[in-house]
UniProtKB/Swiss-Prot annotation:
Part of the 30S ribosomal subunit. Forms a bridge to the 50S subunit in the 70S ribosome, contacting the 23S rRNA. It comes from Mycolicibacterium smegmatis (strain ATCC 700084 / mc(2)155) (Mycobacterium smegmatis). GO terms for biological process: translation. Gene3D superfamilies: 6.10.250.3130, S15/NS1, RNA-binding. GO terms for cellular component: cytosolic small ribosomal subunit. GO terms for molecular function: rRNA binding; structural constituent of ribosome. The keyword Transit peptide does not apply. InterPro entries: Ribosomal_uS15, Ribosomal_uS15_bac-type, uS15_NS1_RNA-bd_sf. Belongs to the universal ribosomal protein uS15 family. It holds the Pfam family Ribosomal_S15. It comes from the Bacteria. This is Small ribosomal subunit protein uS15. One of the primary rRNA binding proteins, it binds directly to 16S rRNA where it helps nucleate assembly of the platform of the 30S subunit by binding and bridging several RNA helices of the 16S rRNA. SUPFAM superfamilies: S15/NS1 RNA-binding domain.
Length: 89
């Protein structure tokens, strides 16, 4: 269920500012989005897994806060990010 090192490296290569970038908001949002997608698929099969559902809600809230920060700092970066990730906003 957790992201493998290869998956993280691939995501960070696409969305990070440089190869070893793990701290930029874009990289963090991209990693959170992948984790949210994986958890959503898990919960489609395991509908009664309430602990994972709570974890999903926490991840969504964290991603929302990071996106809010990016929107406040630079609207162009925010729009580019949500377009590349395919998020509805």
């Amino acid at each position: 269920m957790a992201l493998t090192a290869e998956q993280k490296k691939e995501i960070l290569g696409q969305y990070g500012l440089h190869d070893t970038d793990t701290g930029s908001p874009e990289a963090q949002v991209a990693l959170l989005t992948k984790r949210i997608q994986d958890l959503t698929e898990h919960l489609k099969v395991h509908k009664h897994d309430h602990h994972s559902r709570r974890g999903l809600l926490l991840l969504v809230g964290r991603r929302r806060r990071l996106l809010k920060y990016v929107a406040q700092v630079d609207v162009a970066r925010y729009r580019s990010l949500i377009e590349r990730l395919g998020l509805r906003r």
